[in-house]
């Protein structure tokens, strides 16, 4: 892959949970033949709503090398919608927000808005809360009385970032603000992952 001496960075936002890869490939590598645990090419993951700088694209344009707030690696291009930096940062800092406090929660099922239907959202993620939405106005054709209305990032077919309202059940483990940084909360949140595979 040819990398230019200087590069005009694009900006974007992760729209689905995506793997951070050491190289631009989904191929896996293990310490021994027949291994199935600890893929050595898997670095970490990024969650929907994470702003990124797009620093480089693979030759086939299927992968982006991105810089997130805390990590730099390759991600699938289909997992990122690109937009001007101001638009990306405005979404990332917009208030009020809804914070995911369960290990994972899912948006409400919607047969006609598949991009925001049953989307998995992970602990630590937060999304703009649409507290200004009139209760009498449906969200994607569905009433919102039993749900929080949040705004989710989407990737259009041409790769451009777009935002769409979605419903998050009020029964889901979420909060209107970050949890206080206390030992009790750290332990309580940690136990929400008990029994999950690493």
Predicted segments, located by residue:
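A general structural signal for short secondary-structure junctions and capping/turn motifs
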Residues: 10-11, 44, 56-57, 118-119
């Amino acid at each position: 892959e040819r990398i230019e001496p200087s590069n005009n960075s694009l900006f974007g936002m992760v729209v689905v949970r995506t793997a951070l890869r050491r190289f631009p490939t989904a191929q896996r590598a293990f310490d021994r033949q027949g291994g199935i645990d600890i893929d050595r090419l898997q670095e970490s993951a990024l969650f929907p709503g994470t702003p990124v700088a797009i620093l480089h694209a693979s030759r086939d344009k299927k992968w982006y090398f991105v810089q997130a707030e805390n990590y730099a690696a390759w991600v699938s291009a289909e997992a990122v919608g690109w937009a001007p930096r101001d638009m990306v940062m405005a979404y990332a800092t917009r208030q009020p927000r809804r914070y995911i406090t369960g290990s994972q929660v899912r948006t409400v099922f919607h047969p006609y808005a598949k991009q925001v239907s049953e989307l998995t959202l992970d602990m630590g993620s937060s999304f703009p809360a649409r507290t200004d939405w009139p209760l009498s106005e449906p969200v994607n054709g569905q009433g919102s009385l039993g749900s929080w209305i949040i705004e989710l990032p989407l990737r259009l077919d041409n790769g451009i970032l777009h935002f769409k309202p979605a419903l998050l059940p009020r029964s889901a483990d979420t909060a209107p603000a970050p949890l206080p940084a206390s030992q009790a909360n750290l332990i309580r949140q940690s136990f929400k992952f008990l029994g999950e595979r690493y």
